[in-house]
Amino acid sequence: MADSGLLLKRGSCRSTWLRVRKARPQLILSRRPRRRLGSLRWCGRRRLRWRLLQAQASGVDWREGARQVSRAAAARRPNTATPSPIPSPTPASEPESEPELESASSCHRPLLIPPVRPVGPGRALLLLPVEQGFTFSGICRVTCLYGQVQVFGFTISQGQPAQDIFSVYTHSCLSIHALHYSQPEKSKKELKREARNLLKSHLNLDDRRWSMQNFSPQCSIVLLEHLKTATVNFITSYPGSSYIFVQESPTPQIKPEYLALRSVGIRREKKRKGLQLTESTLSALEELVNVSCEEVDGCPVILVCGSQDVGKSTFNRYLINHLLNSLPCVDYLECDLGQTEFTPPGCISLLNITEPVLGPPFTHLRTPQKMVYYGKPSCKNNYENYIDIVKYVFSAYKRESPLIVNTMGWVSDQGLLLLIDLIRLLSPSHVVQFRSDHSKYMPDLTPQYVDDMDGLYTKSKTKMRNRRFRLAAFADALEFADEEKESPVEFTGHKLIGVYTDFAFRITPRNRESHNKILRDLSILSYLSQLQPPMPKPLSPLHSLTPYQVPFNAVALRITHSDVAPTHILYAVNASWVGLCKIQDDVRGYTNGPILLAQTPICDCLGFGICRGIDMEKRLYHILTPVPPEELRTVNCLLVGAIAIPHCVLKCQRGIEGTVPYVTTDYNFKLPGASEKIGAREPEEAHKEKPYRRPKFCRKMK
């Protein structure tokens, strides 16, 4: 009784507003009780206004309109355990509503078809309607079973071999687009029969039935398979590198499609995360492909230039893939030392590309036709040697296929003058110049501008005696051969193609260098992965592999990036990244070693390795390299540059207890070349940011 009296007493003390609010009728807009408009949020007021307008348009009471809206929303909800009521049959007097229901059901019918179907462990089937795309992240092997699709500019048709695609998190996501292909005039039944026969060798009966049920003319059927390579396993074995290929993120709702793609090793991404090409980029690609396929004036030489982070490398890959759709091979001249495409960093190389490039540089390293190890990620303070190496490598170009020239992103001050020298030296037929809103100012490199400007080592056309540009003075400065002086190269002009890109990248001048260093380390790790046994054998630690023993008197040594005292040469070589080169001089006449070179030679580089130890008693170098033994017999020079072994290789050595070899905290940064040796790249020009000043709304008057 005491409790009940206490409750009654508490009830009588309630406020008048609460009793009035509970007594008055509630307007049912939803399952929640009515609230004042003042307490509604912006989205709630907007939803209420939309319901009022909809009810006014339909001519019913707004409360009835709210009920209709709630019923329509309930109809769109997924089925639950409670069965939905069976709709009443449509009266015969209203035949006009039947076509509307039919069209509504037909427009929603494709949404009920799952876009991805699991067809086994690590396999998924993707059915793409014509001109539809599938953007994803991760790595997989793609086989086109029926139709025709395009990935990164490369066309994959039915019957062609599978392609390995690397849509990693260091670059933009890739997409699989279904193309419109030519078909003979056949009925849909005949097309289904043809597709069913093509799928027999890849899919079982149930999967073929699912494909035929969802089949439509001009569609493409793609098989996605799990991909695992020795390169991927080796890179992901180091801490912090696993997220590059597969990045797990929490999913609010796990669907069958997510599970099917997860077994493959990929993840569907939004279209905006994929690669988007501007109209000027597509126009430039179309023009260059047409010129390369016509071959009226010979094979074109295409030089691509522009500032940093504007999409030059992405354009080059897309152009290579486009050209490989029509041509058997494409030549590629790498002149960017810091971000090389097919080789470890610090190289100038010439390659013949016969297979598509469907990923970032560290996923498609190739063996070049000719390569010279410069030894630094930048040509600062040694431009003349850089020009000499470019000319030496370019001399191997046979002009049998189109040539794409990749240049550095340094386009200001001396970098622009160096680019003008490259244009005069290589005589390109087309110059593709990139520009964007966030890039540095760069003048249009028209033929007239190049003729009127002086380079670092070349003079303008107006300063030459002849009206046609000749490289005679340039040859004297670079010590060309006598036969080359007698027949100098003639400059005939080029066609300038401007490309505007809105390439948005989250790189700032502060973190650009760290990002570029990560990409260089990934290229070195990819090269070292060639030491691993083929799949499915397990990985072997680098310190467990047997190195080659090289006598002191068999090879010559040269430190390219800094002057080192002869007594400290072996300290610089030990535990370093070395270039395995071949020079013309014979070094076999020396009995003792080490043999030191006074100047850095311009010679062919056959590969790279790690000097993992030096035996002073037996006078042997211990070199760990994936270069074949038949090529190692011709190596007689070791070049050591500023390119360093990634820190993770030295720090994360499995099976080692105690002190890790070659790892120390006692490092003297004041030694010549010490900052370059640890991988720090000296920028071409110091980036000076202006301090942020707060706006002044008033000033004090004296």
Swiss-Prot record:
Q: Which family does it belong to?
A: Belongs to the Clp1 family. NOL9/GRC3 subfamily.
Protein's organism? Homo sapiens (Human)
A GO molecular-function term, please? Answer: RNA binding
Subcellular location field = Nucleus; Nucleus, Nucleolus
The record's region (Disordered) falls at: 69-101, 680-702
Region Interaction with LAS1L: list its residue ranges.
Answer: 480-702
Listed under GO cellular component are: intermediate filament cytoskeleton; membrane; nucleolus; nucleoplasm; nucleus
What does the UniProt entry list as the effect of changing S313A? Abolishes kinase activity and rRNA processing
Query: Where on the tree of life does the source sit, at the highest rank?
Result: Eukaryota
Alphabetically sorted, this entry's keywords are: Acetylation, ATP-binding, Isopeptide bond, Kinase, Nucleotide-binding, Nucleus, Phosphoprotein, RNA-binding, rRNA processing, Transferase, Ubl conjugation
Protein name stated in the entry: Polynucleotide 5'-hydroxyl-kinase NOL9
Basic residues compositional bias: what residue ranges? 690-702
Segments of skewed composition (Basic and acidic residues): 680-689
Q: Quote the subunit structure annotation.
A: Interacts with PELP1, WDR18 and SENP3. Interacts with LAS1L to form an ITS2 pre-rRNA endonuclease-kinase complex.
Task: Give a single Pfam family match.
Answer: NOL9_C
Q: Write out the GO biological process terms.
A: cleavage in ITS2 between 5.8S rRNA and LSU-rRNA of tricistronic rRNA transcript (SSU-rRNA, 5.8S rRNA, LSU-rRNA); maturation of 5.8S rRNA
Q: What class of enzyme is it?
A: transferase
